[in-house]
């Protein structure tokens, strides 16, 4: 395992469920594990001397050294708190004590920023699902970000813009926030403090008497810049406060061990790039432990460690007691599922045993509400990546201008038609615009019936062509599936042309699948009717991304046309450049269909 601590937690939790571990035992567990590893490598070294021919005696030496080196890099305190959380205790043993002390004391935000003289807060949502932060491309445009802050401040001149505790964010675009864990890539997204968005050079003052334990220039992209950490003591406990994104000069005037009086000015807010490349703000954080940090401290955590970190770093609003900073209740995934079951039709099904709440797209990834990235190998809507900047911008610009229908003259509909026609063979030069792939295939079948006067359609096994009544009637994927009604009278299905798992396997089987199409034609003609159309995807999508046998499509098209039918290429899921090599799937087969349908 890349993350030995994370791997150990399931073992500790399982052991505790059967043989409960006491809190005092958990204090020593990190060292006990380290000692056991030392014993293993020491005994292996001794065995090599005592019995050099018995390799079994040191079989565990190499993996033990690997784990020991990783274990040595883990902060003992963080391991202790993680073990406590895994066993059902509060991760930090003084969490309740701090909460109790904070509940009996109240501090005003204006004490942090007396020159501003504001206590009320305008909450700013910077979460993964926030529409305020806009497109991912905008995250690092600090001028644009500051402009939006200024506009928000104008709307709320008597309030301080603030927020962010335990907020999952995707603003952290530096690779320093990413790592490879036991289950793949993961990113730190959970914000551990409160951000106060105020102008550069705003003075920051101490909320409590304290002692300087860290005063550094935490240089680097998306770091703190000027960072100050103070230690505070009450009669009952010890805790720390962190002040990030300050001017370097205002921080470095302090030395370790300096005593700070409550109300004293301690720093000034910096602008970018001095503050780590952020719009000006104060990152304010409370900690119950410094762990092993001396010149830095995490301000953002991995989601899987959130319960541990929120115990180590309590909510700063326990001090301020601001309604606006209070964490709002949001529906859980189970709440969303329950509502769907009650009010949404069953056709809107969910994937996975534990459905995922997706709130943002970015290129090849979908992001859940905690900012966790999922490589999207399922959805085919985003031709050029999720939320492609140029596509989003074009849509925003047009929606801000006009959104109407095709009854009026406009250049755009003609320009789109021209661009599509340029990708098609010259024979295909008349377009019909509809709202979806289902409507496109529905219209194609209606045109077939109008032109040929025939109703009989030939389609592939496991083919899918849409969700309207007429499209379901020609979609084996639907009518042969669960709750399907079987093959309709005027639909004729031939076997899925799959050379690996289909009815005919191996090379040179295209002609056998063509013969199956011929059988469908003969059955139609035997009933005294003629073929209306032949419809197929150039790559069968719902059937398993099946490539058609070489030569199959051209021969099948010829048979259908000889019988008076029309050939439809359903490109809804595979067209528009998705295949990479060609813009249209039918171009892979050197054919020209009579009708091409697209959507999505």
Regions found by a protein language model. Name each.
Residues 500, 537-550, 564-588:
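Conserved PLP phosphate-binding loop immediately N-terminal to the Schiff-base lysine helix
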Residues 418-533:
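PLP-dependent aspartate aminotransferase-fold enzymes
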Residues 107-133, 252-274, 280-329:
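Acidic, glycine-rich catalytic/binding loops that coordinate metals and/or anionic ligands
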Residues 330-362, 380, 513:
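Active-site-adjacent loop/helix segments that line or gate small-molecule/cofactor pockets in enzymes
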Residues 206-250:
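Zn2+-dependent peptidoglycan hydrolase active-site motif and core
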Residues 39-93:
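ATP/Mg2+ or Mg2+-diphosphate-binding catalytic cores
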Residues 1-19, 34-52:
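Active-site activation/catalytic loop segments of kinase-like enzymes and analogous catalytic loops
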Residues 373-454:
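Glycine-rich loop-to-alpha-helix module at the N-terminal edge of alpha/beta enzyme cores
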């Amino acid at each position: 395992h890349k993350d030995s601590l994370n791997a150990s937690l399931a073992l500790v939790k399982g052991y505790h469920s059967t043989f409960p571990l006491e809190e005092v035992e958990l204090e020593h567990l990190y060292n006990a594990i380290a000692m056991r590893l030392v014993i293993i490598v020491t005994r292996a070294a001794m065995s090599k001397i005592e019995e050099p021919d018995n390799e079994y005696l040191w079989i565990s030496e190499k993996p033990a050294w690997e784990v020991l080196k990783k274990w040595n890099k883990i902060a003992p305190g963080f391991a202790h708190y993680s073990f406590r959380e895994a066993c059902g205790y509060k991760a930090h043993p003084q969490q309740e004590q701090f909460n109790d002390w904070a509940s009996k004391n109240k501090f005003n935000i204006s004490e942090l920023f007396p020159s501003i003289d504001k206590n009320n807060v305008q909450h700013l949502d910077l979460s993964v699902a926030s529409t305020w932060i806009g497109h991912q491309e905008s995250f690092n445009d600090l001028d644009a970000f500051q402009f939006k802050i200024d506009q928000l401040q104008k709307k709320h001149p008597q309030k301080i813009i603030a927020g962010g505790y335990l907020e999952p964010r995707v603003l952290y675009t530096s690779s320093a926030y990413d790592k490879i864990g036991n289950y793949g890539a993961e990113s730190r997204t959970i914000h551990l403090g409160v951000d106060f968005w105020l102008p550069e050079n705003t003075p920051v003052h101490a909320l409590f008497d304290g002692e300087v334990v860290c005063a550094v220039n935490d240089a680097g992209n998306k770091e703190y810049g000027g960072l100050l950490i103070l230690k505070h003591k009450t009669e009952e406990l010890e805790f720390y406060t962190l002040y990030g994104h300050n001017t370097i000069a205002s921080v470095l005037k302090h030395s370790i061990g300096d005593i700070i009086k409550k109300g004293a000015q301690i720093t000034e807010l910096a602008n970018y790039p001095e503050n780590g490349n952020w719009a000006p703000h104060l990152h304010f954080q409370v900690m119950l432990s410094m762990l092993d940090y001396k010149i830095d401290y995490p301000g953002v955590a991995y989601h899987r460690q959130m319960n541990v970190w929120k115990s180590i770093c309590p909510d700063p609003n326990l001090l301020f007691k601001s309604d606006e900073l209070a964490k709002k209740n949001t529906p859980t995934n189970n709440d969303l599922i329950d509502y769907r079951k009650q009010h949404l039709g069953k056709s809107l099904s969910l994937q996975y045993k534990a459905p995922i709440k997706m709130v943002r797209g970015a290129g090849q990834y979908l992001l859940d509400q905690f900012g966790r990235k999922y490589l999207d190998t399922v959805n085919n809507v985003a031709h050029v990546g999720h939320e492609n900047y140029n596509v989003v911008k074009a849509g925003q610009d047009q929606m801000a201008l006009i959104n109407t229908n095709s009854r009026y003259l406009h250049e755009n509909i003609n320009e789109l038609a021209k661009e599509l026609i340029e990708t098609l063979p010259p024979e295909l030069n008349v377009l019909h615009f509809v709202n979806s792939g289902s409507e496109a295939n529905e219209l194609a079948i209606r045109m077939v019936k109008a032109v040929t006067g025939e109703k009989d359609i030939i389609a592939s096994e496991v083919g899918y062509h849409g969700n309207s009544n007429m499209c379901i009637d020609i979609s084996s994927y639907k009518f042969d599936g669960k709750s399907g009604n079987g093959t309709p009278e005027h639909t004729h299905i031939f076997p899925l042309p799959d050379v690996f798992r289909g009815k005919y396997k191996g090379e040179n089987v295209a002609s056998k699948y063509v013969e199956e199409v011929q059988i469908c034609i003969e059955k139609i003609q035997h009933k005294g009717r003629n073929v209306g159309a032949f419809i197929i995807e150039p790559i069968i999508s719902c059937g398993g991304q099946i490539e058609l046998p070489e030569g199959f499509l051209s021969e099948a098209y010829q048979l259908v046309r000889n019988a008076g039918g029309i050939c439809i290429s359903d490109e809804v899921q595979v067209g528009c450049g998705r295949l990479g090599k060609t813009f249209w799937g039918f171009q892979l087969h050197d054919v020209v269909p009579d009708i091409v349908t697209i959507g999505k």
